[in-house]
């Protein structure tokens, strides 16, 4: 007995994971490193160009928020093991529907927004139902909807208005309670005080002399932060979040333990459509118009942001915070190239390079996690 008690029990001990290894397998690692590198580079090459004053910060924050809104939906869907290539077309379609309902048909803007949300979420549900019922790859199904929605977005305004851009939404939205939730600003009083105190810049001449250059936080940014917080909470603090990981990691095993995989996937398609419609509504309220070309390539930008944030293309692994950091990188780089006087078309080159790098890094991380060689 004593010999057995004294025998080494190394085979019964739980293998400890080093702190370094834990850090390396965090999905946010790539996003964190990329964010630091991007900020350092632009601080060096564009630091004196106004990129980091109040107006410059607002500019790249708005662009980042746009990417962030659609990246949250794409992130949760990819973790669940699916893709949605119709996101960009959904943005254009949703914006056009708001314009047609409110301008052409004369509906109140709040009603046009609500009906558009219902319509787009229903289309997202249809995407999900087709995928789970037929077993077809979501890549193919949503690629089909990419063309269907874009086709309707071009055809309908031409049929009804004989043009592909419908304006006048800003005037129709004046005083509308729901439009203000997508196109207004918050904390205006705070920024007025900051301007009066000399903390932020104010206009020195013209009709706005004495007023702060930044007069509030756009609702676009508020929506982005709210969706990131919501997505992170659901993914990391709820049972449904565990279901999302399980559905993307091993759908068959998840079914065996009672996870409603099909329902999870359909709901994620619906949430992705919701995020795209939020983006479209904010965009329409900002510009006061809807255009048939809105949202082009946004589906790929959303996926790239998610991959930069550490999500695996195979599903079952990822982070909403990581996706948000990927979106932040996009916004900073897109605006930073302008401030650094670099040709803006190189932004597409950056997207391709960073996507390739992120996929290679994520593949290495997956092999570390699974022990593959």
Describe the residue ranges of each PLM region.
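Transmembrane helix-bundle core of multi-pass membrane transporters
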Residues: 142, 146-238, 290-292, 370-373
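Transmembrane alpha-helical segments in multi-pass inner-membrane proteins
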Residues: 269-270, 276-280, 286-352
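Single transmembrane alpha-helix segments in multi-pass membrane proteins
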Residues: 38-45, 53-105, 109, 129-136, ...
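Hydrophobic core segments of alpha-helical transmembrane domains in multi-pass membrane transport
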Residues: 31-44, 74, 147-154, 221-232, ...
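Helix-loop-helix hairpins and the membrane-proximal interhelical loops
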Residues: 20-65, 281, 285-293
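Helix-loop-helix "hairpin" substructures at the membrane interface of multi-pass membrane proteins
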Residues: 108, 112, 116, 122-127, ...
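Loop-to-transmembrane alpha-helix initiation sites
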Residues: 27-28, 138-140, 165-172, 216-223, ...
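Cytosolic-side transmembrane-helix boundaries in multi-pass membrane proteins
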Residues: 1-44, 198, 256-263, 333, ...
